[in-house]
C-alpha cells in the first residue's frame, strides 16, 4: 500500500466519500496544490473516482491564512460567523483555464467556454469548516480572469467537512513543507555558487498548467 502513495503528497484529509490532499509539486511555481476528489466504493476498483478538481493557491495567500490560523484570528472569524449565521465564504479562490488554452491542449469544451475552478472556505453548520471546490463553464473577462458561469450547478463538486484541528493540520503541514523546500532551494544556490536575492518563480510553467491572478484571489489550475 505504501507504494501507492503519491510521492508529492504532504497530507490528506478524508471526509465522507471525499478527500483533499496537499501536494508539493507546485512549490517551484510559488503555489500550493490542493487536489480534491470524490469516490464511490460501490464501483469497480480503478473506476471509483467520481469528481476531481485541482486548486492552486499562491504561497503568500497560504501564509496569510496560516497567520490567521496561528494567532487565533481564524477561530474568532469562525465563531462570529456561526453566531450571526453568516454564510459568506471566509476566503475564495478563483482559477481556471481559458477556452484558447483548452483548444491548444486538445481539451476544448463542447460549449466552447473556458473551464472555471473555484475553491471556498466556509463555516460549516455541523462541523467547523467546509472546504469546497467546484468546476464548470466560465468566461474570460477583460482582465483575463476566468469568471464562473455555472451558478449553483457546477459540473464537478467536492465538499470536504473539516474540524478546526483538521484544517490546521492541512495548512500548517503544507506551510512546513514549503519552508523546508525553500531552505533546500537556498542551500542548492549556495552550493552551486549562484548569487540571487529572491526565489525565481517559473514564469513559464509546463503546458499542463494555466495561471490566473485576481485582485485578491490567485490560483493556477492543472489540466487533466
Regions picked out by a protein language model, each given a short descriptive name:
Residues 1-27, 210, 217-223:
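An N-terminus-focused feature that recognizes amino-terminal "leader" regions
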Residues 38-58, 143-160:
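A cross-kingdom feature marking solvent-exposed beta-strand/loop segments within repeated
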Amino acid at each position: 500500500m505504501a507504494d501507492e502513495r503519491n510521492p508529492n503528497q504532504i497530507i490528506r484529509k478524508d471526509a465522507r466519500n471525499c478527500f483533499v490532499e496537499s501536494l508539493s509539486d507546485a512549490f517551484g511555481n510559488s503555489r500550493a496544490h490542493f487536489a480534491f476528489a470524490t469516490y464511490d466504493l460501490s464501483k469497480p476498483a480503478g473506476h471509483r473516482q467520481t469528481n476531481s478538481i485541482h486548486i492552486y493557491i499562491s504561497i503568500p495567500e497560504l501564509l496569510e491564512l496560516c497567520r490567521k490560523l496561528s494567532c487565533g484570528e481564524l477561530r474568532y472569524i469562525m465563531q462570529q460567523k456561526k453566531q450571526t449565521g453568516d454564510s459568506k465564504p471566509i476566503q475564495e479562490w478563483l482559477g481556471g483555464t481559458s477556452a484558447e488554452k483548452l483548444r491548444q491542449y486538445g481539451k476544448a469544451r463542447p460549449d466552447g467556454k473556458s473551464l472555471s475552478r473555484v475553491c471556498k472556505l466556509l463555516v460549516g453548520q455541523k462541523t467547523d469548516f467546509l472546504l469546497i471546490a467546484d468546476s464548470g463553464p466560465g468566461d474570460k473577462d477583460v482582465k483575463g480572469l476566468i469568471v464562473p458561469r455555472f451558478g449553483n450547478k457546477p459540473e464537478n463538486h467536492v465538499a470536504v467537512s473539516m474540524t478546526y484541528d483538521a484544517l490546521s493540520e492541512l495548512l500548517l503541514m503544507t506551510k512546513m513543507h514549503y519552508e523546508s523546500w525553500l531552505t533546500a532551494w537556498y542551500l542548492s544556490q549556495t552550493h552551486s555558487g549562484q548569487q540571487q536575492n529572491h526565489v525565481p518563480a517559473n514564469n513559464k510553467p509546463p503546458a499542463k498548467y494555466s495561471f490566473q491572478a485576481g485582485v485578491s484571489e490567485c490560483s493556477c489550475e492543472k489540466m487533466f
